[in-house]
């Protein structure tokens, strides 16, 4: 994501000036909102952007621009004074198809700050114009170039932009620009955009924009907007040849030639006409010039070479414009060449439109204290900007190998892709040299591209960056051309600016590839060496330039120093995504890339892809909270961390991000030696400091993960404090600090930051570094001593600060972590790796207790708690050992393995320091948690004892360690937990749940912390329980099941981690809901332990298990974990595994207070567990899973104890495991269903189903007979949904075939057999009952069974969460009943089945669906909706009438029950397709997903991974229930659970009317985040029954014509469900489930062909909350949705228009109203602002854009199909800190 917070100025300079400070003005001059740009991008502007192929460039005011090279960025004094012109050009280089969609995301963000006063006049003088160009290059990530536009540069630009400037500017630039015009193919889209802009009020822009060539397209949009202001600019645009460059090259150096000239002419024109406008236009133009370079590389029509030329020319212009502009030119040329090389590789395919991917760009602007940040430099404010505002430009897509993740061309490029734009005036000089040395050193480091990418574009006195930028960007990395250009421009700008003032001049948009180590040369001067972070190649170099860096700058003048410095300077403006990515990938990569030394490019490719996918998902949720925190903490950071400065804080985040960088983390884990090597090469091996930096980078990586966790859980405030610590500890400490503050260990942070570890780390870089990562790097021993004191003071300050922030942040983090499986998943992933790491060090366990307790503990202390180190050295060390340091678990494990002794020594040393820090932290931070901490210690000891008695030491070492890790969530989550929760986690792990609960409540801050901790504590407890089979439900379900059933320790660990994460998630949800409930959970746990009902549940479960679960147990690990281990848990639960039992009880009993949060989350956990039992993803759910399993299996038996939980317990069962799910639910359905299932199912599946059905039968009988009657609403619900569907389906005889089919499917999906069997066949049905129970959660009954039945039915009714997706194509009807009952779980399971091989798709499917339900359901209803979110896809092949009837039933159910709204019956196109979808979801998910249109729900928060089985035919998976992302689903998806269902299950791909509940969506706000694109080719006759997704029309319509794919937006990690014609040109989208790139056919033709009901949940369209979650591909959306397809009938069917039949044309006003209520995007002719019920228009737009805007006050982007080039497809969202927009690249 490219997040830029920029001010948008009005058309007139005066307006701009007025609006500058507070408001952001869209390039269209439409004053977004004076105050923050919070989601205030004008809808039109965004729409305009969407219309044009390029992302909008957001211009602040043309008034501001980079001054002459010496001039720093400063706001012009002209009327638009203080206005900056930001052109965000989303010119994404077209990535060759081979590269994959994620690779090419060249987004150019150009901030042109033109001093209105200039030589030529306020804006005229090119030199006076400072251009800040943020370029996102496919391989380079974000590059910010801030440079003055020289007259020459401007001349070139000006000719294109403004005739006035042209004469002034030299013609050469024009020529340079002329190459830019090559992209003129994109001109049309651009023209569209321009037109839009013009219509938006651009006065002369439209003509100009129209002129813009494709390359300019991206810039054009911004430019067009700018053009609004500049009349003079318009003339420029008309010059096609020049216009592109001109447009692209805003005054910023990026497009120096044209840009400058454009700026110049623009300036004059703008000054005369509209200062801002011209400037804006110029800026965009120039930016586009750069982008043209970049743009062509981005895949705009312009050729890569042209763009290269432009790039070079622009670079040359830049060089001319600024001191370094020449260097920039050279750089540009080199860069250009590289870019061309890379661009060609990726651009050609994109040109071919083979590469199609979605990138989400967030432009984040954070305010930084003017003075402090300056010194710090990282977050130094842009001078041109408000002094307080620092614009962090981050390409989340690029972060952490964001590009790599999607399989971008090269990791290097990916590295480039991740760029951190930071304004570090103070780092001015340093910055430039940094890029040089960085680039130089980096190339030496080995990933020259990456290294180059890391070159920071900074303007500084030292910015003789002519050489450095070229060296870094041009030379180092082909993917870095943009970066280099930017660097050249920035360098030139920096050079110019540096003269003017380091602060102002230092607009450092350091765009580093995520692969780059987070550059953590901390601002701390002492820690200049710590630039090691930057050294870490794998890490994104989040360079925080600061005074320290400035100091470093001198050191880094040499290439090595410069590299370190540069890296240090790389700041993470947008750490959130990186963090998430890192978290997701880090654990994963830790596992995957055990040997990757320094996150080599190759290693990082896959890992990065994964990371990007995972972190993208997590990031979506992460980013916004993070940004919020960022905003808060940015100022606080600035003041508090004034020394460090906001940059420092950013660096902190960056460190985290760096840690997040999969590569870095991977390398950390992979090999200490490699890490050292990477650090050396990154730091230019020249300096020991560099090594230390590198070590710190490792640390940074670890911290990054931690930070991700903390960021996710907590807010940036967390980071904020860490920043303080960072300040104190500086880079190394900062890295540790990142983790430490996250750990809420200010002292620990200080100690860690202190560098005891750091020095040791330097010594034992690999392990030590890793260790240090976790525990404040042992290598810091020497440094920290002195540092410790300062950090400790800061620590105290931060401690107090952290207390507040962390308690808050931890709560949030837990919520987020839990809600998005991401954090948990990351933990989960990391644990396997961790376990492996831990395994090798055989002494680790003893070490854990003894040495590790010291060293690991200390390492951990840094990560977890320094206090823990001291206090919990024994307890935690013994329990956690390697796992104790979550990150340590990942890194430290390696460190233990690799340099265990080293770490030992270092840690001993660190121990001392950490002790002092620990003491400080204890005194300060732990003051509130001290008792908890001690109790935790005690509990940990207890835990250890408990674990040992359980005889699960092995698990303890692996599992418990994992559990501990799990308690921390995983390397990432774990750290987060350790961050603050570790104590609590571990305390609860043992018996402290109540104790801790009591103690925590004692302290308010503690309570907050505890709230955060608590969720983890249960995890830990569960983990412990996991160690003991009965000890923890989740652990047993996850840990035990994998261990017992799978017997795979890694899987077991995963399970453990999943469990812990699930628990964490669960608790986090509880945190989110209530801290008390969490306490309650603990208490309940203990009580539950004693409570008979729990045992009963267990016993019942045992019985159930004995009857049918036994087979399940054997059959499926997850099920076994859920079902099999559960009975075991029963026995041991009361005894050794009390905490686990209580945990289960907690879930079940504590469901009351946390019904919403816990139940939902547990449910999510269950779902995740079912899927995640096998998959890491389900780890967070795993916890809930077991709970659910224990609660769910016994649901029928033990309804009373867990009535609330019972409601969701069934969900638990359903989601938790197909088997467990089946066990409780199936018994209900068993009789009816088993009959059908018995014949076909594999014995295991049959047995499982039978057992499940039997259990379910009990529930069902109760539901139908007893339960149903007990809760009046339930009978109807049960009948209408699960029961009714089951009965009707069974009656129809579908039950038999379907039952058989599900079993068959289960068989087919061997891995999902158990889960899927229940899932596909009975589980889906069971899920409904369980969901009913879940629904019951909202109104838990005294009697569990009746309550469960009632809740289940109620929930089913309330939340038709499960779209009716006939798991089996054959048994549509039966599936419908099934799905209605457990639609969500079932569907999830189906998804699991369908993506079970993919698996984390399955896991996500199972898990996220649950996650969303727990997370998002404010009520059981929400949970149900989420649970039911699975779409029921009835096979179209099946008798359409039957399907229609089924659908009708579903619809009627929906109708009857508003909650049912979520049920979306989606007839699958064909029985075969359905069978495929259902039968081979896993397979199809893995391999077929692309062929079968893997329909991952595009639920960023919800795990899009869980998707309905893709229909090989494509588009049969019309809807996928989109589980909430583990990242953000829980929190944001309370209601989304239901809503996502709707969008997730586009009815059949043909017309795929989503009857997504309008209500659920409305309720959930922007929850539903699945964007289903019906292939336009499927003009699918309006569904015959538009009301209920017309089964027949959708089923029968051309299933083969379209394929629905869940495509991952690697940039944002969002998933888009795209129905695409199979034949049309395909776009390559990354299918995270298969990890493959799917070519999604996208053609303009398609759009009109098949009207796609696109009820896009507001969430999808509410960028503020989720950012643009959904992106509607114009190609996907028919230009006009057929009225029948989009009839509002579904809405009528669904109560309250719950099912929005997204009929663009036919939707009546009420439909429109419904859409508005439930913000769905419909393809409609109306402009985004127009009412949702706009008449169908030729251009598909987001219907309900207006509604969306109304609901969320967020602009909706109207997306018009454009042939090629990037275009904004999702409404740009602005949360006040960041603006994010989804850019589609074709």
Swiss-Prot record:
Keywords: Methylation, Phosphoprotein. Residues 467-480 have a biased composition (Pro residues). Residues 232-247, 422-438, 1105-1115 have a biased composition (Low complexity). InterPro entries: CEFIP, DUF4585. Residues 306-329, 810-828, 845-861, 1153-1164, 1223-1238, 1301-1319 have a biased composition (Basic and acidic residues). The modification Omega-N-methylarginine is found at residue 1767. The modification Phosphoserine is found at residue 1179. The modification Phosphothreonine is found at residue 721. The lineage of its organism: Eukaryota, Metazoa, Chordata, Craniata, Vertebrata. Residues 140-191, 203-329, 400-480, 746-907, 1081-1180, 1218-1242, 1291-1348, 1362-1460, 1477-1550 are annotated as: Disordered. Pfam families: DUF4585. Residues 149-158, 248-259, 1131-1140, 1167-1180, 1336-1345, 1389-1401, 1504-1521 have a biased composition (Polar residues). This is Uncharacterized protein C4orf54 homolog.
């Amino acid at each position: 994501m490219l997040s830029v917070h920029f001010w948008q100025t009005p058309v007139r300079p005066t307006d701009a000036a007025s609006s500058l400070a507070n408001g952001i003005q869209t390039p269209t001059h439409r004053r977004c909102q004076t105050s923050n740009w919070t989601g205030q991008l004008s809808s039109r502007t965004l729409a305009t952007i969407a219309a044009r192929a390029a992302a909008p460039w957001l211009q602040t005011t043309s008034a501001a621009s980079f001054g002459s090279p010496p001039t720093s960025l400063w706001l012009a004094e002209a009327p638009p004074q203080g206005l900056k012109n930001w052109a965000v050009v989303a010119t994404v280089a077209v990535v060759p198809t081979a590269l994959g969609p994620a690779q090419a995301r060249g987004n150019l963000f150009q901030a042109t700050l033109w001093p209105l006063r200039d030589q030529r006049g306020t804006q005229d003088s090119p030199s006076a114009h400072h251009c800040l160009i943020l370029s996102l290059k496919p391989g380079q990530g974000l590059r910010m170039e801030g440079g003055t536009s020289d007259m020459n540069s401007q001349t070139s630009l000006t000719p294109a932009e403004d005739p006035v400037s042209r004469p002034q500017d030299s013609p050469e630039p024009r020529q340079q620009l002329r190459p830019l015009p090559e992209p003129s193919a994109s001109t049309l889209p651009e023209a569209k955009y321009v037109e839009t802009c013009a219509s938006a009020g651009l006065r002369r822009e439209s003509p100009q924009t129209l002129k813009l060539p494709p390359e300019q397209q991206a810039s054009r949009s911004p430019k067009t907007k700018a053009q609004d202001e500049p009349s003079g600019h318009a003339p420029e645009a008309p010059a096609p040849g020049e216009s592109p460059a001109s447009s692209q090259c805003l005054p910023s150096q990026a497009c120096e030639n044209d840009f400058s000239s454009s700026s110049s002419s623009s300036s004059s024109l703008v000054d005369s006409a509209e200062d801002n406008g011209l400037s804006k236009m110029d800026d965009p133009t120039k930016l586009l010039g750069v982008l043209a370079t970049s743009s062509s590389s981005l895949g705009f029509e312009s050729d890569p070479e042209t763009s290269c030329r432009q790039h070079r020319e622009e670079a040359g212009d830049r060089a001319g414009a600024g001191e370094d502009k020449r260097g920039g030119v050279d750089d540009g040329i080199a860069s250009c060449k590289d870019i061309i090389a890379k661009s060609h590789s990726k651009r050609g395919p994109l040109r071919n439109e083979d590469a199609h991917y979605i990138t989400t760009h967030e432009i984040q602007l954070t305010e930084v204290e003017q003075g402090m940040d300056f010194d710090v430099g990282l977050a130094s404010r842009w001078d041109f900007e408000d002094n307080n505002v620092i614009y962090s430009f981050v390409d989340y897509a690029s972060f952490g190998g964001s590009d790599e993740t999607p399989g971008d061309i090269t990791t290097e490029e990916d590295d480039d892709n991740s760029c951190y734009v930071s304004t570090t005036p103070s780092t001015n000089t340093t910055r430039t040299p940094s890029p040089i040395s960085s680039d130089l050193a980096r190339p030496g480091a080995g990933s020259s591209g990456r290294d180059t990418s890391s070159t920071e574009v900074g303007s500084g006195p030292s910015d003789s960056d002519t050489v450095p930028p070229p060296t870094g960007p041009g030379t180092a990395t082909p993917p870095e051309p943009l970066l280099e250009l930017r660097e050249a421009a920035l360098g030139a700008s920096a050079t110019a600016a540096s003269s003017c003032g380091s602060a102002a001049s230092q607009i450092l948009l350091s765009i580093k590839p995520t692969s780059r180590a987070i550059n953590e040369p901390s601002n701390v001067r002492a820690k200049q060496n710590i630039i090691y972070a930057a050294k870490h190649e794998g890490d994104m170099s989040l360079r925080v330039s600061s005074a320290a860096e400035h100091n470093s700058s001198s050191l880094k003048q040499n290439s090595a120093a410069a590299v370190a410095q540069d890296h240090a300077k790389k700041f993470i403006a947008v750490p959130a995504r990186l963090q998430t990515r890192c978290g997701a990938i880090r654990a994963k990569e830790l596992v995957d890339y055990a040997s990757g030394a320094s996150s080599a490019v190759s290693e990082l490719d896959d890992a990065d892809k994964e990371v990007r996918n995972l972190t993208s998902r997590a990031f979506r949720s992460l980013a916004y909270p993070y940004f919020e925190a960022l905003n808060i903490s940015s100022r606080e950071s600035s003041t508090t961390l004034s020394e460090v400065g906001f940059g420092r804080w950013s660096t902190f985040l960056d460190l985290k991000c760096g840690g997040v960088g999969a590569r870095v983390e991977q390398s950390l884990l992979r090999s200490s030696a490699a890490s050292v090597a990477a650090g050396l090469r990154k730091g230019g091996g020249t300096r020991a400091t560099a090594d230390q930096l590198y070590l710190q980078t490792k640390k940074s990586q670890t911290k990054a993960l931690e930070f991700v966790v903390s960021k996710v859980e907590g807010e940036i405030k967390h980071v904020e404090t860490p920043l303080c610590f960072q300040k104190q500890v500086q880079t190394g400490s900062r890295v540790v600090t990142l983790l430490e503050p996250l750990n809420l260990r200010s002292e620990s942070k200080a100690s860690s930051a202190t560098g005891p570890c750091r020095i040791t780390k330097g010594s034992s870089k690999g392990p030590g570094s890793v260790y240090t990562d976790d525990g404040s790097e042992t290598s810091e021993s020497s440094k920290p001593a002195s540092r410790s004191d300062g950090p400790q003071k800061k620590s105290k300050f931060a401690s107090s600060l952290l207390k507040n922030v962390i308690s808050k942040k931890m709560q949030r983090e837990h919520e987020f972590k839990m809600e998005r499986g991401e954090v948990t998943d990351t933990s989960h992933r990391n644990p396997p790796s961790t376990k492996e790491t831990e395994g090798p060090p055989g002494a680790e366990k003893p070490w854990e207790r003894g040495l590790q307790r010291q060293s690991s503990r200390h390492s951990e202390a840094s990560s977890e708690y320094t206090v823990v180190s001291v206090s919990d050295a024994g307890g935690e060390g013994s329990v956690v050992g390697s796992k104790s340091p979550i990150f340590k678990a990942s890194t430290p494990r390696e460190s233990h393995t690799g340099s265990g002794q080293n770490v030992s020594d270092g840690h001993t040393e660190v121990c001392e320091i950490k002790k002092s820090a620990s003491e400080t932290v204890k005194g300060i931070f732990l003051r509130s948690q001290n008792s908890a901490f001690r109790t935790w210690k005690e509990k940990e000891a207890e835990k250890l004892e408990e674990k040992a008695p359980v005889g699960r030491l092995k698990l303890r070492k692996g599992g418990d360690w994992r559990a501990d890790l799990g308690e921390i969530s995983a390397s990432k989550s774990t750290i987060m937990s350790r961050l603050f929760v570790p104590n609590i986690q571990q305390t609860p792990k043992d018996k402290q749940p109540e104790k801790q609960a009591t103690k925590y409540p004692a302290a308010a801050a503690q309570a907050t912390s505890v709230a955060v901790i608590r969720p983890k504590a249960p995890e830990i407890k569960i983990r412990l329980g996991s160690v003991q089979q009965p000890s923890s439900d989740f652990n047993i379900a996850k840990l035990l099941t994998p261990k017992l059933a799978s017997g795979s320790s890694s899987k077991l660990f995963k399970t453990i981690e999943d469990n812990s994460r699930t628990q964490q998630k669960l608790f986090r949800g509880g945190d989110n809901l209530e801290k008390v409930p969490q306490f309650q959970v603990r208490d309940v746990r203990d009580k539950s332990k004693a409570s008979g009902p729990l045992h009963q549940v267990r016993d019942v479960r045992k019985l159930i298990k004995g009857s049918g679960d036994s087979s399940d147990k054997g059959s499926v690990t997850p099920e076994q974990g859920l079902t099999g281990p559960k009975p075991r848990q029963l026995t041991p639960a009361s005894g050794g595994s009390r905490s686990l039992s209580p945990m289960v009880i907690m879930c079940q009993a504590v469901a009351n207070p946390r019904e919403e949060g816990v139940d939902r989350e547990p449910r999510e956990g269950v779902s995740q567990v079912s899927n995640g039992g096998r998959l890491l993803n389900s780890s967070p759910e795993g916890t809930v899973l077991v709970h659910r399993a224990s609660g769910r299996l016994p649901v029928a038996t033990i309804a009373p104890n867990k009535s609330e939980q019972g409601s969701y317990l069934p969900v638990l069962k359903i989601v938790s495991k197909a088997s467990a799910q089946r066990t409780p639910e199936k018994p209900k359905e068993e009789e009816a269903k088993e009959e059908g299932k018995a014949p076909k199912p594999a014995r295991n599946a049959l047995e499982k189903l039978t057992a499940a059905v039997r259990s379910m039968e009990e529930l069902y009988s109760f539901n139908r007979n007893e339960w149903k009657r007990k809760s009046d609403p339930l009978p109807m619900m049960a009948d209408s949904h699960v029961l009714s569907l089951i009965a009707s389906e069974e009656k129809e005889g579908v039950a038999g075939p379907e039952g058989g089919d599900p079993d068959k499917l289960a068989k087919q999906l061997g891995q999902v057999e158990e889960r899927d069997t229940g899932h596909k066949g009975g589980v889906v049905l069971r899920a409904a009952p369980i969901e009913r129970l879940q629904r019951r959660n909202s109104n838990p009954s005294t009697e569990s069974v009746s309550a469960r039945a009632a809740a289940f039915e109620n929930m089913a009714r309330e939340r038709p969460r499960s779209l009716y997706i006939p798991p089996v194509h054959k048994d549509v009807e039966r599936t419908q009943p099934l799905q209605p009952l457990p639609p969500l779980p079932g569907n999830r399971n189906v998804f699991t089945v369908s993506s079970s091989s993919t698996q984390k798709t399955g896991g996500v499917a199972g898990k996220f669906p649950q996650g969303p339900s727990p997370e998002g359901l404010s009520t059981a209803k929400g949970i149900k909706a989420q649970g039911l979110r699975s779409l029921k896809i009835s096979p179209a092949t099946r008798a359409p009438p039957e399907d229609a009837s089924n659908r009708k039933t579903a619809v009627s159910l929906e109708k009857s029950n508003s909650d049912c709204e979520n049920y979306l019956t989606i007839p699958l196109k064909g029985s075969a397709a359905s069978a495929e979808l259902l039968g081979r979801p896993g397979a199809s998910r893995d391999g077929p997903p692309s062929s079968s249109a893997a329909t991952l729900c595009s639920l960023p928060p919800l795990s899009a991974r869980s998707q309905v089985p893709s229909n090989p035919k494509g588009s049969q998976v019309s809807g996928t229930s989109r589980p909430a992302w583990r990242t953000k689903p829980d929190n944001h998806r309370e209601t989304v659970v239901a809503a996502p269902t709707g969008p997730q299950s586009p009815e059949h791909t043909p017309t795929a009317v989503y009857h997504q509940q309008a209500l659920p969506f409305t309720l959930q706000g922007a929850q539903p985040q699945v964007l289903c694109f019906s292939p336009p080719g499927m003009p699918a006759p309006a569904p015959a029954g538009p009301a209920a997704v017309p089964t027949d029309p959708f089923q029968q319509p051309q299933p083969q014509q379209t394929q629905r794919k869940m495509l991952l937006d690697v940039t944002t990690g969002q998933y888009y469900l795209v129905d695409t014609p199979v034949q049309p040109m395909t776009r390559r989208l990354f299918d995270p489930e298969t990890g493959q790139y799917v070519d999604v056919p996208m053609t303009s033709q398609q759009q009109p062909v098949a009207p796609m009901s696109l009820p896009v949940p507001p969430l999808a369209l509410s960028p503020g909350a989720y950012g643009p979650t959904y992106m509607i591909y114009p190609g996907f959306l028919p230009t006009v949705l057929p009225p029948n397809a989009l009839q509002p009938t579904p809405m009528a069917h669904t109560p309250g228009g719950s099912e929005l039949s997204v009929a663009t044309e036919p939707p009546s006003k009420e439909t429109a109203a419904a859409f508005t209520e439930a913000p769905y995007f419909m393809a409609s002719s109306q402009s985004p602002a127009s009412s949702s019920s706009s008449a169908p228009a030729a251009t598909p737009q987001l219907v309900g854009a207006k509604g969306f805007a109304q609901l969320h006050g967020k602009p909706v982007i109207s997306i018009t199909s454009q042939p090629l080039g990037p275009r904004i497809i999702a409404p740009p969202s602005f949360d006040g800190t960041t603006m994010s927009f989804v850019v589609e690249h074709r």
